[in-house]
Amino acid sequence: MSLEAIVFDRSELENVSVKVLDQLLLPYTTKYVPIHTIDDGYSVIKSMQVRGAPAIAIVGSLSVLTEVQLIKHNPTSDVATLYSLVNWESTKTVLNKRLDFLLSSRPTAVNLSNSLVEIKNILKSSSDLKAFDGSLYNYVCELIDEDLANNMKMGDNGAKYLIDVLQKDGFKDEFAVLTICNTGSLATSGYGTALGVIRSLWKDSLAKTDKADSGLDNEKCPRMGHVFPLETRPYNQGSRLTAYELVYDKIPSTLITDSSIAYRIRTSPIPIKAAFVGADRIVRNGDTANKIGTLQLAVICKQFGIKFFVVAPKTTIDNVTETGDDIIVEERNPEEFKVVTGTVINPENGSLILNESGEPITGKVGIAPLEINVWNPAFDITPHELIDGIITEEGVFTKNSSGEFQLESLF
């Protein structure tokens, strides 16, 4: 990708630099927001300038690292006044409270919770601020590197599994897939989770096409030929972000509205064989919290006999919560649902309208009466009964003969 969601300069251990891409301005404007403190991390997560469970965990962890380095090197900074730096026990107490505050930015995303628990453990075992800084730096670097490696594994695991299933079913033609929200490079350290599987399927398709064109392999076999990303209201992560990534990678795709899924499945010239979605939290029985609209997609896939897969690293699995009934679902500000935010364009030719500084102008357009009541949950819960497989870096987990997932090996 030409755009990185997170820019982390780790060249200087004692003076790291962190910037995150303001994804609210995509696809027309590229602007990075610097992260110096936990407050900065909280702000970009809460406002959804950064989103995607893996990316949220990474940015949250990085914001802790930048704050720790700031108070260590600049004890007169504003944020340093929150701490009693002469007393390590007092400093740890304040840091623990700051970590709890950071978690409140996105309570549904278990990756952030898991990362902050790990950071609290590092804090507990650290003898002083310098030791904590060094251990935290190593943890964050490992978190980022492992996320990218695991994304590649998930992509290949999911692609191979679907191709094998289709071959066993005797399907040998071109097929399409569905996806919702954004689960690609912009939601992770790179490559993506659900969109990573789609990238791997596209690589497989290109390789098969090359072999066929060169005469090395004339046998018909299943290959992905098209992707249908859902727009994903009300924040339009599908139209703003996933569509951007698909266009950049030159993967054949057609954007569809959330309300047109069933009709698209019924009328698609290319048979739709699977849906791949990400996850913000997967509990012990496989129930999954993900972007609002995921449950609707799962129900429709069940109706049409389309395979429905959740793609997430094992860090997204909550080994404490038994069922989805106990997941806390964040509700967004009702006002967000009454407007559409975007870049202003010239209606005659589609060109961007720029301000005096030459930057694209963004604005909000009201789409609902201000007096109307609004229910605006950020997520919904898909019961495990509607999920055909959970794709992780460890492999693809399917249900047993009793219709239950057995995820204990991932805990």
Swiss-Prot record:
EC number: 5.3.1.23
Residues bearing the modification Phosphoserine: S351
Catalytic activity: 5-(methylsulfanyl)-alpha-D-ribose 1-phosphate = 5-(methylsulfanyl)-D-ribulose 1-phosphate
GO terms assigned for molecular function: S-methyl-5-thioribose-1-phosphate isomerase activity
Residue numbers marked as site, Transition state stabilizer: C181
Record PTM N-acetylserine, positions in chain: S2
Subunit structure: Homodimer.
UniProt name for this protein: Methylthioribose-1-phosphate isomerase
Annotated source species: Saccharomyces cerevisiae (strain JAY291)
Organismal lineage: Eukaryota, Fungi, Dikarya, Ascomycota, Saccharomycotina
Encoding gene, per UniProt annotation: MRI1
